[in-house]
Amino acid sequence: EWKCIAQEYVKLNIAAKEKADKEKNQTIRSIAKLLSNALYGSFATKLDNKKTVFADQLDSSTAKGIANGEFSVKSSSFIETDCLSAEIMSELVVAYSPDTLLHPQQEGATEANTQETPTFIGPTDHVTYTYKPITFLEAEEDEICLQTIEKNSPLIPNDRYPSHIASFVLAWTRAFVSEWASLLYSEDLGTPMERRCLKSVYGDTDSLFLTEEG
């Protein structure tokens, strides 16, 4: 039993396209044509054989597939950590007396003598340095690593799009255009291509662009 698929949708877009032609509204015409083509294109959509997961969330079957060559890791990237909770340690300051380290205090030294030891201040004009804060992030490497995994087999299981409908539509339109082409070139059968009269300049899935002779 033959049944129409998306008949109301197709009629609505065709009517909108014809109305736009009469009103010379190219914007509406383009939108209507785009929606009509999108219906056929949706049936022929190819499923993506890639998936992106966190490295620590790889299931056992995918990990086994990577090991035996069924899958391959196409890319690895790390997410931005600026928005994650972290602890920032600012400039580290260490105060010590090298002079004290070189001359340890003798036993029995009084506290007063210790306080009288001058603070060592070395020269600062022979070296330059820049302090940078240290960021401590509580996250493992696998927790912020994104891996894009692709299946190596060209055969992709399709349980989402009715590609058989797209194949039927494409085959039917090719048969329709082929029938018109046979009528157009019926007089040229047996004639070499270079000697035939130019009757068409372009052929699309469902259309032929003809010359004046055609």
From Swiss-Prot:
Disulfide bonds: none
Biological process terms in GO annotation: DNA replication; viral DNA genome replication
InterPro entries: DNA-dir_DNA_pol_B_CS, DNA-dir_DNA_pol_B_mt/vir, DNA/RNA_pol_sf
Any coiled-coil regions, as ranges: none
Enzyme Commission number, as recorded: 2.7.7.7
Substrates-to-products reaction catalysed: DNA(n) + a 2'-deoxyribonucleoside 5'-triphosphate = DNA(n+1) + diphosphate
Secreted is among the record's keywords: no
GO CC term, one of those recorded: host cell nucleus
Pfam families named in the record: DNA_pol_B_2
Keyword Transferase: yes
Record key words, sorted: DNA replication, DNA-binding, DNA-directed DNA polymerase, Host nucleus, Nucleotidyltransferase, Transferase, Viral DNA replication
GO MF entries: DNA binding; DNA-directed DNA polymerase activity; nucleotide binding
Top-tier EC class: transferase
Superkingdom classification of source: Viruses
Annotated localization: Host nucleus
Subunit organization: Heterodimer with the terminal protein; this heterodimer binds to bp 9 to 18 of the genome. Forms a complex with viral pTP, DBP and hosts NFIA and POU2F1/OCT1 for initiation of replication.
Role of this protein: Eukaryotic-type DNA polymerase involved in viral genomic replication. DNA synthesis is protein primed, and acts in a strand displacement replication. Assembles in complex with viral pTP, DBP, host NFIA and host POU2F1/OCT1 on viral origin of replication. The polymerase covalently transfers dCMP onto pTP, thereby initiating complementary strand synthesis.
Remarks, miscellaneous: This DNA polymerase requires a protein as a primer.
Similarity comment: Belongs to the DNA polymerase type-B family.
Name of this chain's protein: DNA polymerase
UniProt organism field: Tree shrew adenovirus serotype 1 (TSAdV-1)
Gene that this polypeptide is encoded by: POL
